[in-house]
Amino acid sequence: MIGSVSAVSCIDCEAGRYAIDTGSATLEDCIECAVGRYVVATGNDEAEDCIGCAAGRYVSEPGSDEAEDCIDCVAGRYLDVEGGSAASDCIGCAAGQYSETSGNDAADDCIGCVAGKYAEAEGSNEASDCIDCVAGRYVDVAGSAALSECKDCAAGKYVAVVGSSAASDCIDCAAGRYIDVGGSDSDTDCIDCVAGKFVEDTGSALESDCTGCAAGKYSTMSGSAACIDCEAGRYAIDTGSATLE
């Protein structure tokens, strides 16, 4: 009929928008999808037509019209819900963990620092952010979050390298020597038993582990692992003799 208005004269709201009410007269009546959401189709008539960005992604501008508008959370961060609306919605990997990939959608995507290392900061994004335990210490579990989680080598032991991952990495002081504190980082921390005393075991932790040479034996050198018998024709009455006199 001449002068009639056809429904085809009504224009779809464009992608990224929707209109709930009938009788919309302008494009501005079409409402933009909220931040964190998008819609690819045109002619949308309810807010639910807008789709939340997938977990691990966000969009901070309204009216997005394609999934590609959603931005990956950066490496070192994750987002475990849909519809992220800002980079700040992405959660940093916990201290002791890192993630080298972007778009992570779960805390489980964060990887624990290996044993022997730790990371104090949140949001670490590469394995190199994990720091070696210092010499003299070790940590035997993954995911450590502080230097304080690195354990001292026990008294009587030391380790000179960094990044030790087990108590067995700590090395015994040699026979004839001891060390009475933990956390030693060099064999030079091991102390010689004085002349006239010895210790035959490795890993001694006390000065009292050094035992005086028995009567008939002596030791003229410090750091002895054993005492020497007096030669034929000579004797030593006292224990702990350091000379042949």
What are these regions (language model features)?
Residues M1-E245:
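Disulfide-rich, cysteine-dense extracellular ectodomains and adjacent flexible linkers of secreted
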